[in-house]
Amino acid sequence: MKALSARFASAATVLTLAALTALTAVLALTVRDGDRLGDDPVGLFWWYAASWALFAAAVAAVRRFPGRRVVWLVVAGGVAVAVTGLLGPPRTSTDSYRYAWDGRVQAAGISPYDHTPRDPALTRLRDPWLFPTGAVCRTPGLAPIARAGAASPCTRINRPGVHTVYPPVAEAYFLAVDRLSPVGARHKPLQIGAALISLGVTGALLLVLRRRDDDLRKAAYWAWCPAVPLEAVNNAHIDVLGVLFAVAGLGAVASRGPARRAVGGVLIGAAVATKLMPAVVLPGALSGVRRFRDAAAVLLPAAALVVLSYLPYVFLSRGSVFGYLGGYVEEEGYDASSAGSRYALLRLLLPDSWALPVLVLAVAGVTLYVMRSGDPRRPWSGALLVTGWSFVLLTPGYSWYALLLVALVALDGRWEWLGVALAGAAVYVLGPAFGFQQALTNLAYGSAAVLVLVMAGIRRRPAPAGKWGDPVPRLASAEPAAEERQPEELSGTVRDSEVGS
């Protein structure tokens, strides 16, 4: 029997390493191949699909990997995967150019909320990298900048005629990167910073899982996910910083004691003040809370951090510190049920005018369910439920939004929610090839929703021990099964199958 177990462990090691090696190679080729989003989005998506398939193979193989070495494998694999994002400039997003510009503007002592990149008052801050001239301005994706008395330049910054939309913690990060970057470093410091933060998320996941005596293999759902090198590292999306704060905050909230819950509230507040979207984890942070003071221990520090982070910019700015936020919401169609592909699945089933009210009611219902019945020791389970269904119903068109969802999957282990992240990638990459038709959004997010519902049904069915268990097998040191716990430990909790449905 021992010889057979050793043989299985050896085979699992070989399969895991082979899948990781292939995944790293495909991601490297995807990044090095160049910007094909406008030229060949279908071809680019095949590279994405290959990387996701290899990712699935790797996390499936690691289930049988010897537990004593799993931390080193998760970390080493995460480093290899993250490094692939550094092999080229941003390929499918220009957001990081705005980050670099906002950092430069702040370094000059100017509020990033006061001027647009097109404003002539900031001409002295322009350089040939962000504001090139000549033939390069005919490249798709570059926007013209009018300037009297000189050759008309263009800019790599998207929406150069509007004010920045990023919250204050994000802006502070942009300033820090600008201050620490050598002259002429261009996009690379933002990518390196994002890579380090993504590895920090892996470390935070491992710490939270270890504290819970949970299976450390779950961290591979984040560390090896293709969305991390492609969106967090290569495109350097600021969302990854919000993910780090959110994971650390939920880990602190899961600890007993008001002081740690307050620290968790501060960290979640920092996540919200980085990208706003992590506010969806707040219901999870309040899972099973019955007393007002317990809720206040999280909410008040979170709100205080958000308010305090805005204050310096309020005093420094002459205009609104919310920048283009309202315009962005309108542009993306979140304020109009009939615009674009937002609320696609709801609009498939209901009249357009019903979509927004139904979404609000549905998300409110999920939120109340989590707050009333969630397990306070596993706040990420409720956070995953609220975040996942919010994504399914909102059907966002940007793939990097799902970075938060991927991290919550790594904490909770319900891998089926990764289908929502893949759906976002499909909609974003294939959109140009299909004219951004709503049918693509319906197919992608509809398939993801079906997968979630099917797996929820499977998890609710009684099964013989060992046939259906956690998505990732527990280690020998894992948390004891429910029947082995003391009765008082089980009161007020939600079954895993309920939280993950």
Question: Locations of the language-model features?
Answer:
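Multi-pass membrane glycosyltransferase architecture that uses lipid-linked
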Residues: K2-G326, A355-S501
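Membrane-lumen/periplasm interface segments of multi-pass, membrane-embedded glycan/lipid transferases
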Residues: E330-A355
